[in-house]
């Protein structure tokens, strides 16, 4: 640890921060508007430079948490990889942990999972104590773009689109029976959790589905849907680090969405949250920026993304997805980071008192590869899914009962009774 970092760390002892930010010094000026805005909201913030090894950083977080007030951890910077071999590049990054994988390796995943989860676990019990988010900026320009999006998002007036979910379903490919079971479970989860006053707009990659766009129009439809305002944009399907699943097209097979499409996105304020329930789309340790990273740092991309760093599995995806929706729409924590933290904690628990979870467990025993270890599968999915974005982001909830409140429509203002 360098002398500057040591002095700053010792100074924390006298403070009682609720938010710790790990930020390279080169990014501080780009972060300044965010810091000022959050402090005006009442947050006590400590900002420290990154360290070379995750174990060192974890010890620093534990020291700051001794105040007993720490709730949020914001990591500013990408994960170092082979491309960041030079010291000047590595000092702009924040390291991550690598934990052994035992379950998803049966589906072809790597032997380790890239994960920021240990930073959230202050008492080493395997459950997150902090709400953690990583803003994967490679340079001050990208961080400034993210900060501008955050400020626009939180300052925008309520809109009709705040009650809209846009959902894209890819092809299953696990076998006809498993695909049918997974699709039925996903629809049941949506019915049980999404408020009835929400509009759910669907696009399907299955050409026989009534939600399928005209032939050859799937990719443009998805880009337009993602560019539209809404509470969240959710993708359910296969993925790779830089793209979603590939589907038949006039020129062969092309991705439903890729990093090449990101510059053309025009997400209208307030930008939606992107939830990518898929393999690899959040692989922030890959040699190049993954799809979720590109979406988040783009000026006109989604406000944040929840995505996985490794191969995901149907059961783990379904449980974590269910708990995300339940936390968001039933518990309604104020911030995005606390939505994910609550969902992670519930995913790790057996939740026998919840009527949906035993049903999902029963279905999983019929489709998961033997030997079945549902608890271990849930742990791995909690480890690999991350929030790429600001954990302090205040979500745009619309009150279920709004009296004489003016809500802005997409093109006009309407009065909600």
Residue ranges: model-predicted function:
Residues 2-13:
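Sec-dependent N-terminal signal peptides
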Residues 15-417:
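Cysteine-dependent hydrolase recognition
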């Amino acid at each position: 640890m360098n002398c500057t970092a040591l002095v700053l760390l010792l100074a924390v002892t006298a403070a009682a921060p609720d938010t710790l930010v790990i930020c390279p010094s080169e990014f501080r000026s780009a972060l300044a508007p965010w810091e000022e805005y959050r402090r005006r909201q009442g947050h006590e913030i400590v900002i420290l430079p990154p360290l070379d090894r995750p174990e060192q950083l974890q010890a620093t977080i534990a020291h700051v948490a001794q105040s007993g007030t720490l709730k949020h951890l914001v990591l500013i910077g990408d994960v170092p990889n082979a491309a960041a071999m030079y010291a000047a590049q590595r000092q702009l990054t924040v390291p991550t942990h690598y934990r052994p994988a035992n379950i998803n390796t049966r589906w072809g995943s790597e032997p380790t999972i890239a994960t920021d989860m240990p930073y959230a676990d202050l008492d080493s019990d395997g459950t997150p104590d902090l709400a953690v988010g990583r803003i994967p900026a490679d340079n001050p320009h990208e961080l400034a773009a993210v900060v501008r999006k955050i400020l626009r998002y939180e300052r925008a007036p309520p809109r009709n689109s705040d009650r809209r979910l846009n959902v894209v379903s890819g092809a299953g490919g696990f076998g006809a029976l498993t695909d049918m079971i997974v699709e039925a479970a996903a629809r049941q989860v949506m019915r049980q959790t999404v408020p009835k006053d929400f509009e759910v707009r669907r696009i399907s990659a299955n050409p026989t589905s009534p939600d399928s766009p005209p032939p050859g129009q799937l990719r443009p439809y998805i880009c337009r849907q993602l560019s539209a305002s809404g509470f969240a944009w959710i993708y359910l399907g296969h993925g790779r680090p830089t793209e979603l699943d590939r589907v038949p097209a006039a020129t062969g097979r092309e991705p439903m969405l890729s990093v090449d499409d990101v510059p053309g996105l025009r997400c209208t304020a307030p930008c939606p949250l992107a939830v990518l329930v898929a393999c690899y789309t959040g692989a922030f340790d890959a040699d190049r920026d993954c799809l979720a990273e590109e979406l988040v740092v783009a000026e006109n991309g989604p406000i944040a993304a929840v995505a996985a760093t490794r191969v995901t599995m149907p059961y783990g995806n379904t449980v974590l997805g269910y708990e995300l929706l339940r936390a968001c729409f039933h518990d309604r924590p104020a911030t995005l980071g606390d939505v994910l933290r609550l969902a992670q904690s519930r995913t790790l628990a057996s939740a026998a008192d919840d009527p949906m979870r035993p049903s999902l467990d029963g279905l999983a025993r019929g489709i998961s590869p033997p030997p079945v270890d549902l608890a271990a599968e849930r742990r791995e999915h909690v480890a690999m899914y991350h929030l790429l974005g600001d954990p302090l982001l205040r979500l745009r909830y619309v009150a279920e009962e709004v009296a004489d409140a003016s809500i802005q429509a997409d093109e006009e203002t309407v009065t909600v009774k």
